[in-house]
């Protein structure tokens, strides 16, 4: 149940069965699916000499009949129209058409009618309609991620497109895994309910035969949940490597754009890859905390210096031959050392400049510990601190408001006013909009561990034992959800089943899909949970991979649309 492998296998089959020189044609979504699992050099090995976007191919008129065109695109109306035009005026010798999801019969007829010169050799469906950067984590990279917060009456067609794209993505995941799941959803989320029901309709009615795979001992589970049940996790600063890079610099499809770091010399302002599949150091350190990363990078630098020293000591022809043989590996090692040193150095500067250790300690207290009075004092002090950035002030007030929504409204209003005066760039009412979206009345789970007696006892025990690292003591709500599933205790009343497909006992395979987006802290929780060998394997997916900046951007956009929509309705 590893999605990266499924996607790689699809692309392997696509490219190796077609001999000769090829051009690979992608769209704005499949380019991410391919680039995250396949490197440029691997494409060259498969005789792919050109990678083009379907949009630019439409514009060009140059004939390239010596090349075979391999299309890998989503089966959207827009793509079908572009393909129709390209088949009517073929530039390539052969056309091999691969679609990342289900084609409609009408689309197949359109393509057949357009292929008057009979250049199409094959039409296939390869179900890779998702981006899988880590073994147990996938995303749909949805630009319109804010739509899950908009009431259906405000933008019905936008929400329908959003739901359709999510259903397509979930369907592709299960077709890639060759499974048909039992489906459950979070009761308090209309969007999760809608997606769960539409997915069930596709799998059990419209495409029942396609999803009729060999029965396994227990049916896998698809659980559709809503980001708003845990608004705390995407608001926190992060202190483990992968999550921290995404929070402070940004990680898109396993790539970090160093151009966003203005202080670097021009020759270092490049895009670097951070992939557990391609980088052994990153694979073994992606979930480690920041303090340990520094020590591990120092060890890597020491190892590299030893290799560099031995390369300087070239005295014989044999030494020279050995150096030439080892040079590609040496250059790769040099690039890797440089990449990780640059990232950690830049993050250290940001931590210092934004006083993130002080800010984060208060964040963790707000997320994990009680004490409203002390929390109010700490947040007030940080709002007054000139070194604290606007985004950090906003996040602190949001975390405080989520935690103490029902306590001391006067102090809460004082924090709102102070935030408005200290950080006027944020629209008034954004914190209140968050509470309206994800406040205590809207949530299903025990987010702060203070509703359920068992959770209260567990938090007290953790407090008494002490916490190994004050900056990483927070656990996402997802951790509790996985624990409930593993123990067979996920409540039907909170997470109802769709239709009459129920589950006896606990499932062995679970896909949790989070409408509104996941975080790298949550994907870390999934990886650690899978490493415990509990007998249940989890995959986490979502509409986007969030950091606090993206979560707040989505929130602002939803607030803007809700305001204009409320005037219209």
From Swiss-Prot:
GO terms for biological process: auxin-activated signaling pathway; intracellular protein transport; pollen germination; positive regulation of cell growth; regulation of auxin polar transport; regulation of root morphogenesis; regulation of vesicle fusion; vesicle-mediated transport. It is a peripheral membrane protein. Gene3D superfamilies: 1.25.40.60, 3.40.50.1910, 3.40.50.2060, Syntaxin Binding Protein 1, Chain A, domain 2. It holds the Pfam family Sec1. Highly expressed in roots, lower expression in leaves, stems and flowers. GO terms for cellular component: early endosome; mitochondrion; plant-type vacuole membrane; SNARE complex; trans-Golgi network. The keyword Protein transport applies. Disruption phenotype: Male gametophytic lethal and stunted growth associated with defects in vacuole formation leading to reduced cell expansion and autophagy-related defects in nutrient turnover. Blocked transport of vacuolar cargo proteins with C-terminal vacuolar sorting determinants. Involved in the protein transport to the vacuole, probably at the level of vesicle fusion at the trans-Golgi network (TGN) and not in transport from the TGN to the prevacuolar compartment, by promoting the recycling of vacuolar sorting receptors back to the TGN. Involved in early endosomal vesicle trafficking, particularly at the trans-Golgi-network/early endosome (TGN/EE) thus residing in early endocytic route. Interacts with both SYP41 or SYP42 and VTI12, but in different domains of the trans-Golgi network. Does not interact on the pervacuolar compartment with VTI11, SYP21 or SYP22, or on the cis-Golgi with SYP31. Interacts at the trans-Golgi network (TGN) with the SYP41/SYP61/VTI12 SNARE complex. This is Vacuolar protein sorting-associated protein 45 homolog. The gene is VPS45.
């Amino acid at each position: 149940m590893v999605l990266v492998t499924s996607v790689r296998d699809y692309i392997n089959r696509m490219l190796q069965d077609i001999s000769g020189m090829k051009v690979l044609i992608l769209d704005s979504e499949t380019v991410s699916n391919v680039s995250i699992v396949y490197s440029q050099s691997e494409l060259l090995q498969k005789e792919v000499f050109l990678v083009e976007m379907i949009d630019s191919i439409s514009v060009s008129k140059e004939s390239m009949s010596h090349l075979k065109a391999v299309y890998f695109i989503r089966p959207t109306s827009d793509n079908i129209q572009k393909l129709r035009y390209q088949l009517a005026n073929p530039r390539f010798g052969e056309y091999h058409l691969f679609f990342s999801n289900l084609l409609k019969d009408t689309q197949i007829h359109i393509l057949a009618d357009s292929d008057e010169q009979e250049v199409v050799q094959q039409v296939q469906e390869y179900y890779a309609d998702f981006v899988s950067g880590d073994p147990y984590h996938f995303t749909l990279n949805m630009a319109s991620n804010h739509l899950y917060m908009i009431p259906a009456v405000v933008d019905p067609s936008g929400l329908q497109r959003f739901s359709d794209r999510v259903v397509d993505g979930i369907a592709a995941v299960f077709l890639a895994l060759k499974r048909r799941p039992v489906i459950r959803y979070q009761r308090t989320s209309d969007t999760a309910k809608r997606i769960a029901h539409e997915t069930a309709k596709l799998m059990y009615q419209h495409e029942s035969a396609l999803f009729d795979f060999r029965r396994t001992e227990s049916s896998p589970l698809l659980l559709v949940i809503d980001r708003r049940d845990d608004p705390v996790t995407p608001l926190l600063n992060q202190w483990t490597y992968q999550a921290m890079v995404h929070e402070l610099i940004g990680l898109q499809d396993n790539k970090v754009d160093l151009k966003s770091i203005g202080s670097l010399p021009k020759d270092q302002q490049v895009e670097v890859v951070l992939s557990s599949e391609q980088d052994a150091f990153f694979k073994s350190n992606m979930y480690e905390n920041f303090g340990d990363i520094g020590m591990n990078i120092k060890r890597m630098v020491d190892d590299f210096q030893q290799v560099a020293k031995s390369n300087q000591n070239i005295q014989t022809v044999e030494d020279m031959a050995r150096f030439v043989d080892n040079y590609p590996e040496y250059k790769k090692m040099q690039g890797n050392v440089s990449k990780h040193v640059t990232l950690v150095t830049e993050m250290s500067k940001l931590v210092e400049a934004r006083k993130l250790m002080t800010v984060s300690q208060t964040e963790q207290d707000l997320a994990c510990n009680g004490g409203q009075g002390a929390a109010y004092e700490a947040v007030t002090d940080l709002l007054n601190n000139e070194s604290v950035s606007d985004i950090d002030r906003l996040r602190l007030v949001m975390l405080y408001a989520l935690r103490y929504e029902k306590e001391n409204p006067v102090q809460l209003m004082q924090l709102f006013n102070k935030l408005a005066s200290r950080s006027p760039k944020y629209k008034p009412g954004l914190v209140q909009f968050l509470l309206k979206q994800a406040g205590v009345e809207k949530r299903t789970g025990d987010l702060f561990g203070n509703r359920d007696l068992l959770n209260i006892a567990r938090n007290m025990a953790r407090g008494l034992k002490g916490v190994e690292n004050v900056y990483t003591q927070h656990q996402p709500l997802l951790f509790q959800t996985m624990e409930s599933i593993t123990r067979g205790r996920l409540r039907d009343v909170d997470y109802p089943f769709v239709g009459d497909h129920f589950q006896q006992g606990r499932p062995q395979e679970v896909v949790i899909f989070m409408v509104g987006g996941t975080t790298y802290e949550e994907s870390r929780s999934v990886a650690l949970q899978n490493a415990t060998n509990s007998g249940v394997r989890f995959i986490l997916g979502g509409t986007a991979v969030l950091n606090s900046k993206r979560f707040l951007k989505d929130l602002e956009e939803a607030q803007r649309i809700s305001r204009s929509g409320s005037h219209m309705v």
